[in-house]
Structures are given as structure tokens and as C-alpha cells.
Amino acid sequence: MTESTTRSACPYCGVGCGVLIDSEGGRITRVRGDPEHPANFGRLCSKGSTLHLTARPEVQAQVRLLQPMHRAQRAGAALPLAWDQALDTLGQRIATTVQQHGANAVGMYVSGQLLTEDYYVFNKFAKGLLGTNQIDTNSRLCMSSAVAGYKATLGADAPPACYEDLAHAATLFITGANPAWAHPIVFRRIEDAKRANPHLRIIVCDPRRTDTAELADLHLALQPGSDVWLYHGMLRCMLEQGWVDQAFIAAHTQGWDVLAAQVQHATPAAVQQHCGIAPAELLQAARWFAGVDAGRTGRSPTLSLYCQGLNQSVHGTDNNTALIHLHLACGQIGKPGAGPFSLTGQPNAMGGREVGALANQLSAHRNLSDPQHRAEVAALWGVPEVPATPGKAAVELFEAAADGQIKLLWIACTNPAHSLPDQALVRRALQRAEFVVVQDAYATGATARYADLLLPATTWGEKEGTVTNSERRISRVRAAVAAPGQAWADWRIVTEVARRVQPLLPTRAHLPSLFPYDGPEAIWNEHRESTRGRDLDITGLSWAQLDAAPQQWPCPQGQAQGRARLYTDGRFATPDGRARFVLPQPGTVAEPTDARYPFALITGRLRDQWHGLSRSGTVESLWAHASEPVAQLAREDMDRLGLAPGDLAYLTSRRGTVLAPVQPVDGLRSGQVFMAMHWGDEVLGGASSTGKRLAGVNALTTAARCPQSLQPELKHAAIKVLKAELPWGVWAQAWLPLAQVHLARQTLEGLMAAFPFASCTLFGRPETGVGLQLRAAAHQAVDTALLERIAQVLGIQGQGALSYQDARRGQWRRARLLDEGAAQLLQGMVLAGDVSAQAWIAPLLQERQNAQPLRRALLQAGTRPPVRLTSRGAAVCACEGVAETAITGLLQRCVGDAAQRLQQLKDGLRCGTQCGSCVPQLQRMVQASLTSA
């Protein structure tokens, strides 16, 4: 068989890295970074470098949606359906819903992980064919505040900077972002810039001391929700010190005097009160941002990087505009190394913004409220008109479904039963909607449980089209292998449904086909034409040019290539060419803490996982860095609450409860709790006292949203934390064949609701095998039939199985050992009742140590093994599988300064030599070794 290499793009974050996909015999065998792609120049993070493992046929057969499925009853089993029958069913249901209830009774919820061409046809289907604006995207949850902020100040939704600016900046102002974990390849470029220019100043604004903050020269640990207070305080300092650029303000902006008066309230004392930032730190941040240094003339450039910490707030738009004001006030825009640079969360959130797939936008950044814009789009699409009334944004869409206004929900490439806030509301909506369609590549998301119709879509490695990254760079996405089963491209599914619906709608039946496309290129050509004369004009590009290399927009007809930076001439995308100073209002979070809910929950990402884990969660090695769901608290709070590491605690907000193990960390203020946004009920489950299934971390978050952007405040909620008294536990681990492990996990997921608390995660490495871990707890012993079922699912039975049961004390244990030469290895273990022995059994099993001398001890309670065991310790480097024990052992022999010791670690163990995501942790370990020496 011949191996081939296909150029494509990574499907994870908005950095937009280029990848080279090696395939052989219809199987993806390896993924490498594309050295010619300007976003990453060959680098990949831990997630991108393991993409080929997500495409393993053994995995795909277990987790993918491979054929259309239909439920005759919502609670029943989904049964296979032919494509024609599925399309006819959906087409008829849509037409009937429109005829009986109007077009606004159909709601479509799409995704920033769709390709631009998929996005375009979804948007045209809703606004052009059905005549409704009831379509929104999960990009509403991450980027709509950035959109609103850019439009309000600069006139267009267009990030003005580029990645190259990282190398030119004298100051980096990173706020509401943790690129070390969320945008790792951007962080590698930040590290490069710091090495090349040791004088580069890095300011990080984040309530937590993250890996990004570890690199900072100044960490501003502001209180959640106080961003505008900080930026106004900085602007006031700049005014007082004469650091603003009055010439730039006079020549290129409007509204300065009113804003200058408004920020006078943000005194250093007020900023300290609201943000917790000392006056000296505030002044330092203002000076560095302004680029004014004592003893030198001119102004050094400042680049700001920001993400969900700004956007996911009830003041999200104000956070964005207040930050952009700092750039405008100092002329820090439109030149190398300067500008407000929004880091996009998803791989094609930018593409969705470009095609107008938001409930209040139209194609090519057109405004729904502008009659001329609506007429332009209607003419392009060949329809009489597009509706003027904005549709319902993401949370509103599900509120309307819960209220019975929306009868049919079509959900594509996203998992709202995990990712939307206030999960109790979301699940009411999914239950009440009369017909729910889930179009997805994966069958494992929580939303799929509510679907009446499931449509199998293609995903990374199988798709053709384009995506746009954070720096406005359009990349080609290419298929390396054929789609598995009966999966279809998203654009094809929409087009086929549209061809069935159009003849059934009286206002559209007489028109020529609105969806005559035969492939993504034809769709892209129509999208390109929609951009003519707009701020994102790409009429100078062709599909062939994109095939040759990624291109930035704008690139209007007549230009040879796109523009790296915007507003270099000081003219902005407003009618008069002047940027706008608006009046953002300083505020606080939607839910301040109080006596009843005294803790501030902060959510965020993990280093090696992505979104709802549908893709990244199938890679066993990506679980090593964070092996199970936890809630992190400050050590003093854990002591005060009587919590030890690993204890279970109830986290309760006004909307719901999550039960999770707790873990102490040093990077949080007292009164704050951090929990990763990845933990949905697919991996973190259990049931309430009434038997209701717990819904993961977003059971806690609030649907309160920014009034301008309608983006919800997913970053913060007021909660209380109470120690859980669940004395009877279950702990199970087992190695399983790759071809079975994901089906086993899905079976265990169905059993988790039998416990008040349960979690189910993967462990292992591709070269050593894959396994499952189940952890659960209850008030009292469960029926032994349930334990037998767990053991059966994990293969802990038959030859080599050892068992112990004490029904009176509620103790139950089972182990299975397999002969491996002269040794015996532990294939699987279930502990029930007293589970303290997991402390030594887990490394025994996961590190494949000889268990033969411990056969009898496996069935005994206790935290200590009868013989001394050594453990690899916690994983540090996911790429090379290097853990703490090896690192600390080598550090004892290392010599020299911190940089030399870090290099010796890299040379000796290869940790930190691949994606680099573990380097901040390695640096902390090096520093600790120097301190203790």
C-alpha cells in the first residue's frame, strides 16, 4: 500500500495550525505540523499531535454516528434509517412546522467547528429558504462579545493584528486568556519572543495564577467581573501622567472627551477596592501599556491578547470596548507589534462570523438592521427578501424551545446538553421541543440522547472546505481518507434537505433551486461574491490560490495577497473613518457571592483536552495530565471546610448541583473555586436524591448575558461548597482492548446514575494500552448485581479472577491477573466499600508492575501494600509519557542554572521537546529543585 500525505488544518482551537496527514490503505497513520503554514511553522500542541489517534478505525467504530438513526419515541432506542427516508422525514417535518406555526418555530443551532461552506448553507437555509433568523451558533458562547466590541469601536468585526506581531511587541498585555493551555502554539511564539527579546514585558490579567501568568513580569490577579474598572483605572493613570497620544486621538477618533471625563471615577483606590490591584501595580501596567519609558523618546508597541475571560461576561462587550480604548488612546494600533488581538476559541468561529451565521447578522459582516444590507443578500440569494427581525441568540433559542415557541430544533456539530449554561433549562427545552435533529460526527454527546433524528456527518480528516483562524487567515481543509459508514458532509446534508423543503414552501417553490451546489468550491465562490466591497472582501482570492497556500483577508480584486494588519493608515471601518470611544460601564459579576453562596466559581480549559471531549477524550494519553474531574480550591478554604485532597464536595448554585472530588491549588484566591468546562455528565455523573441525573459543570453556570452581545456569563457563578458524606465507595480500573474500551465506557456511563457520585475516564498510552477508571460513591452499599455488572463490563471475571465479599460490612473486591512470562500483571480491579487500597493498586495496575507477590493483599483493605512499591508519579509530559518521579530523580543529578537544568531534562528524558505544553511545569520543578538544593 502507498502512503500519501495530505495538507489540512487542525480542528481544535482558533490558532489554525496547518497539519500534514499521513495515510495508508484508507487509514490515517500519523499527523505532523506543516512547516510551511504561517500559523504554526510545523509546531503542534499535545492535542494536534495526537489527531491521528482520534481517527483510529477501532475508535471510530465505537464513537462515531455511522448511519442515520430515528427514534419512534423519545425514550426509545434509535434505529437505523436509510438516507432518503431520513431526509424526506426531516424535510416534511420542517415544511409542516412552517405551515402550521410559522418559520420562527424552527430553530437551528450550529457550530464554530463547521467549515465555512457548511456554515454558509445553514445560514442560507434559515434566512433565505425558510425566511427566519432563528439560527445561531455556539460561537455566541465564546466570540460574540469580541464581535460587538470590534464593531462598536473600530467599525467592523475584524481583528487588526496578526501572529507576527508577537515578535514585534515591546509589551504583551494578556487578559482573560490562558494561551499556555488554550492556545499553546501562540504561547510557544510568546516564549520565542521572550527569548529573542529579554526586555519584552508581559502583563497577565487573570484571577488565577495560570501557566501563562508564570511567564509574566506583572500578574494582575483581578477579581472576576472587574475588568472595566482595571482598564478605566489604567486609562485614568495615562491621562494623569500625560501618556495618551493626543495627536492620534484628534486625527483618528471620536468621543474622547466624554470618555476621558467618565474614567475619572476609576481612582487607584477605587480600582484597588473593586479589582484587588495595588496602586503601584496599576501605574506600572499603565506605563508599560502606553509604551512610554523614562529616558527614551517615541512609543514602544503594545499587543493585547484576550479571550473568554473578557467575552463570557454580562459586561463582555464593555470589557472589549474598554480594552480597545486603551489602544486607541495610546495610538497602539495599526503598526507592527500593536493592536487589540482577540484569540478565537474554535477552529472556524471566524468563518461563521464571516458568513453571518448569527441570529442578528447577515453574510459578509452585514447588519440585519440595515435595509440595504438585507436587499443585497436577498438579491445574491435570489429570494424576495430576508427577514428583518433578529432571531433568538443561543440561550434565548433554548428558552423559546422550553416555553414551547420553537417546535423543531436542528442542532449541528455541537453539544448544547453539555456546553450551554443552566443545564436544567437546556434539558427542559430538548424535552419539550416536538422534534429534535442532531447532526454530528459523534454519537457520544449528551445531546444525542434527546434526538428524534440523528444524521451522521463527516469530521476532520474526511472533510473538504475552508476555515479562518484568529489572524483572518483562510486555510484549506482537505480529506485524507473516505468517510466511515454512511457519514455525509454537512453542506451536502443541508443541501439535500433544502431541495426537499423548497417545493413544499409556497413562497419559494416557484424559484429556481436555491441550493444548486455540487461541492464546497461552488459554495465558497458564492460566499466570496457576498464579500465584494465589504471589510472582509476576498474577491481577489480564488480556490486555486487557497489550494496553493493559506491567505489572509481582506484581499479585494486586484490585490495579489491579503493584508497582515488593518488600520495602518489610521482610517477605520466607520462611515467617517474615525474609531469610536464609547461609554463602557464598570460593573461586577451577574451573581455576586453572598452569605448563602460564598464562593466564586471560575471555569476554564485544561491543557490537553478540548470542549466536550468527543474527540480529544478518545485519546488515552491526553487524560494523563488531568486524570479525572476535580474542583480546585485554595488550601486555606479546604482546611476551613474540613476537606482533604480527594474528598467529595457538593458544589451548588441557584440552578443546580455538581458532586466532585476537591484538590488544593496555590494559584487561587481564598473564596474562589476552579472547575474545567470539559466536565459534562458524559464523564462526571451521578444522581440527585430524587433520582435526577446530574448534568456536569454547566448545571451551575448562569444564563445571564451581556445585553449587547447576548453572550452568557459562563466564566462565573456564585456557589456554595459542602463536604459530601458518602462513606461507601467504588473504585475500578481495568485494561481493555482498544476495540472495546469506548463501548465499555458508554455502558458505564449508563450505570453512573445509580450512584450519587460517579466519574468515568480513560488512562494509558497508545504504546502500552488503554484502560478505564470508574470512581463512585454512595450513602450505603449498592446491590451486588450492580458490582457484578461493572466487573463484567471491565472484563474482570473468568480465569485469573480473585474475589472477596463481606456482605455484612458492605465490602466487595474482585481482581483479575494475567500471566506475563514469569510475572503476573493486574488486568483489572474493583474495590467496593473501603476503597483506600486504590492508592497503591492504581500504580500497580497502570504501571504494569508484577502483582504476583501481592495476590492476597489485593483483596485486603488498607492504604499500604505489604511490600514496597515504586511509582512513576503524576504525568507531566503527555507527548513522551514522562512523569514526576523520573523528572525529580534526574533533577537531583542536574547542575548549573535553571536554563541549563531544564535543557538537561529535555536531553535526558525528552520531556518538553515536542509540543512544549509541559515546559511551564518543568520550569516550576526546576525552580523547586534549586530552592531546595
Predicted regions and their residues:
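Flexible glycine/proline-rich, aromatic-decorated loop/lid segments
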Residues: 208-211, 441-478
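Long, contiguous, secondary-structure-rich segments that constitute the structural scaffold
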Residues: 484, 490-549, 616-631, 636-798, ...
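Glycine/threonine-rich phosphate-binding loop and adjacent beta-strand/alpha-helix elements that clamp
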Residues: 163, 461-483, 496-498, 702-703
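Long, low-complexity segments enriched in small/aliphatic residues
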Residues: 352-353, 358, 518-617
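Glycine/threonine-rich flexible loop motifs
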Residues: 179-188, 415-425, 465-468
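A glycine-rich, hydrophobic/aromatic-adjacent loop/helix-cap motif
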Residues: 289-399, 549, 558-561, 570-580
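N-terminal export/assembly segments and adjacent metallocofactor-ligating motifs
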Residues: 1-241, 251, 270, 278, ...
